[in-house]
């Protein structure tokens, strides 16, 4: 293997801003920002969604309307589309 071609693997703090949670995870992501947690300075990255805020993981799934996209389209624009085949 060639020396000095691999990215630096280190502990990085990811901040889920939607729920104000911090995660210390090993990563190779590059960032110029830093944060101090527990007396140690870590690289810092903000994220919008994580396992603490995503509806799939939190169990707070949105209820999906019973009609799909095609039904909504037909309801809105059905009067403009001919129902006869081949015309």
From Swiss-Prot:
GO terms for cellular component: ribonucleoprotein complex; ribosome. InterPro entries: Ribosomal_bL28/bL31-like_sf (IPR034704), Ribosomal_bL31 (IPR002150), Ribosomal_bL31_B (IPR027493), Ribosomal_bL31_sf (IPR042105). GO terms for molecular function: structural constituent of ribosome. The keyword Ribonucleoprotein applies. The keyword Glycoprotein does not apply. Keywords: Ribonucleoprotein, Ribosomal protein. GO terms for biological process: translation. Belongs to the bacterial ribosomal protein bL31 family. Type B subfamily. Part of the 50S ribosomal subunit. This is Large ribosomal subunit protein bL31B. The gene is rpmE2.
């Amino acid at each position: 293997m060639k020396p000095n071609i691999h990215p630096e693997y280190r502990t990085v703090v990811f901040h889920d801003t939607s729920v104000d949670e911090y995660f210390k995870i090993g990563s190779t992501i590059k960032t110029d920002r830093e944060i101090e947690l527990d007396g140690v300075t870590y690289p810092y990255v903000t994220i919008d969604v994580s396992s603490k805020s995503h509806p799939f993981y939190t169990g707070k799934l949105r209820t999906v309307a019973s009609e799909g996209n095609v039904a909504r389209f037909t309801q809105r624009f059905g009067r403009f589309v001919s129902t006869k085949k081949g015309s």
